[in-house]
């Protein structure tokens, strides 16, 4: 079995329980020393064989897989969450082609870690309900589909998380302030370098100071930039509709007149929900059933 495990943003105790279990049971681990702290390997057993992928090509990694049969427990340890810029699809394709069992163990993304360190919610009602994850094209421009980069998404003014772009601060600032951008020079930014590592840096600034702020960190990799009005450090006057006294859910009725206290609804079965604006449950149809995906 080959497990693509998300290591989380850095701190060894931010790997998931399942990820730690897979590391503890692994016969072989492939990890990138340039992106994942060595402390993550403390979760491994004493007999594990470790390969550092920092100097390996895809072909080198696949050769390690091919050298072991399906009974060998292999962990490919990726930084953050494997589904985000993890280059795992080409490895999954190999598993399909060679009839190998595999799984993805999700990890805590650096985006989540960065927002936690910034101390801000990324989706503030009435400010932004959308988070865009993107990057500058850079040396891998061929991988970037047309009109899907930073400048294109800047037109919407949503909260943006820009990864893999710290080495080009002037280009990043220019795209964020393009002629069609909804961002302003005073739009808040937060730069997070090596989130949850011992030497992490958190820098609050604005789009107008972003290039200088990035250069001041000295970082050219493992840095993430958050952009958007949701990052404003002033107290927001907006509030969630979900917890508003007048809002009804499957578990809470709208509050009594003159009161803001919650009013529990009657016990409902897992197949029931409440229609918006009504105090009665409705049965979900068969096409609304939630099921777990089948593991590969």
Predicted regions: what is each one?
Residues 109-113, 119, 222-223:
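Short alpha-helices
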Residues 2, 60, 64, 72-74, ...:
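A contiguous loop/helix-start segment that scaffolds small-molecule binding in enzyme catalytic cores
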Residues 1-113, 211, 274, 295:
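Class I S-adenosyl-L-methionine
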Residues 42-43, 117-118, 175:
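Residue-level signal for well-ordered alpha-helical positions
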Residues 9-10, 79-80, 117, 126-128, ...:
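Residue-level signal for pocket-adjacent positions within structured domains
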Residues 47-49, 120-125, 179, 207-209:
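Short, hinge-like loop/turn segments at secondary-structure boundaries
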């Amino acid at each position: 079995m080959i497990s693509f495990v998300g290591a989380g943003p850095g701190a060894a105790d931010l790997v998931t329980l399942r990820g730690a279990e897979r590391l503890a049971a692994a016969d072989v681990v492939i990890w990138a020393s340039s992106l994942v702290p060595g402390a993550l390997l403390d979760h491994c057993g004493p007999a594990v064989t470790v390969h550092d992928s920092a100097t390996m090509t895809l072909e080198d990694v696949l050769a390690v897989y091919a050298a072991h049969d399906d009974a060998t427990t292999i962990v490919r340890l990726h930084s953050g969450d494997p589904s985000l810029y993890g280059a795992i699809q080409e490895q999954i394709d190999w598993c399909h082609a060679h009839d190998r069992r595999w799984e993805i163990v999700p990890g805590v993304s650096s985006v989540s870690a960065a927002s936690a360190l910034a101390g801000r919610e990324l989706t503030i009602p009435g400010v932004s309900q959308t988070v865009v994850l993107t990057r500058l094209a850079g040396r891998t421009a061929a991988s970037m589909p047309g009109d899907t980069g930073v400048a294109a998404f800047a037109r919407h003014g949503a909260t943006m998380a820009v990864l893999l772009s710290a080495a080009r601060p002037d280009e990043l600032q220019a795209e964020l302030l393009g002629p069609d951008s909804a961002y302003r020079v005073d739009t808040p930014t937060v730069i997070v370098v090596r989130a949850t590592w011992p030497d992490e840096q958190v820098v609050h600034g604005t789009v107008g100071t972003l290039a200088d702020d990035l250069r001041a960190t000295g970082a050219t990799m493992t840095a993430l930039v958050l952009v958007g009005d949701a990052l404003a450090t002033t107290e927001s006057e907006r509030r969630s509709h979900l917890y508003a006294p007048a809002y009804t859910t499957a578990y809470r009725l709208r509050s009594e007149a003159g009161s803001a206290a919650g009013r529990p609804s009657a016990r409902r079965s897992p197949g029931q929900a409440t229609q918006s604006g009504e105090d009665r449950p409705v049965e979900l149809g068969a096409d609304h059933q939630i099921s777990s995906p089948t593991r590969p």
